[in-house]
Amino acid sequence: MKAFSTLFRLGVACVLLGLALPLAKAAEVERPNFIIIFCDDLGYADIGPFGSVNHRTPNLDRMAAEGRRFTSFYVTSGVCSPSRSSLMTGCYPKRVGLHQNEKGQGVLFPGNQRGLNPSEITVAEVLKARGYATGIVGKWHLGDQPEFLPTDRKSTRLNSSHTSI
């Protein structure tokens, strides 16, 4: 009788485990895709998803309709390099050494020997470690020397210019 009881319990445990496996797979959530659009000199209502009637932005309108819009975002600096460093690292510009100062050294122009310290962990590195494909299109402005470029920061693609339009 004792052997039957043990076998019965083992059988019940196997059945419960078999029933639980599909539930565990169903609980796995698919990772979302996302695109961060970071623009210089763009007013809140300058594009369609945020109310512009003066500029047609059909692709941005579609992305906003199918995705998620964030409406309370504040930059940490009024110039590009410090604010980009904050977006990429999650740190204040002063913390990463790219803050604007009275000498106007906040923006990293081509040929500048400074840049975002390679030891800083960026959002691209965190995402890449979690299986995301990462990349940047457009103005980098966090240093144009080889050690500062996003290709050395584990971004998979780079299509960047170092000039302003």
Language-model-detected regions and their locations in the chain:
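Formylglycine-dependent sulfatase
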Residues: 2-4, 10-19, 23-160
